[in-house]
Amino acid sequence: MDGTLLNSDKTLSEENLNAILKLREAGGKFVVSTGRVMQATRHYFEPVGVDFPVILSNGGMIYDCHENKVMWSEYLPEGSSRKMVSDLLERFPEACAEICTPEHIYDVQINEQERIHWKKGGFTAEIMESLDDVPDGNWCKVLFAMPE
């Protein structure tokens, strides 16, 4: 979506909105495919609607917006993912880990870069005291934010 459907200020341009409407008028269908998770995507396409399930997390999840349910997903391996995140947070204590599940976004070691990411992405996360507080299972994406 970034750099394609959305313009540089992360909004859906009038031109793209009109193109979607024109596509539908011609009998076409509109679908979204993005590296984002649902919480950082939904508010962009709700005004225009989608005709098919949305492809999220770089193909790691297919989500039916009409039924509000995950149709298919490939989650990160539980044990090794938690260990990797733990190791990286220990090595880079200034980093924030953003852990995404179908229902929640959790932040561990919140920092200013992550707060900027929230603002640009149009979402917020649940701030966790430690990685141990993040529930196991259904991690679909992990991002790291840190100062340059």
Where are these regions (language model features)?
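Conserved acidic, metal-coordinating active-site core of Asp-based
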Residues: D87, R91-E148
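Short capping/connector residues at structural and topological boundaries
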Residues: K10-T11, L17, E67, L76, ...
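Active-site phosphate-binding/coordination module
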Residues: E14-E114
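Asp-based phosphoryl-transfer active-site loop
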Residues: M1-K10, M84
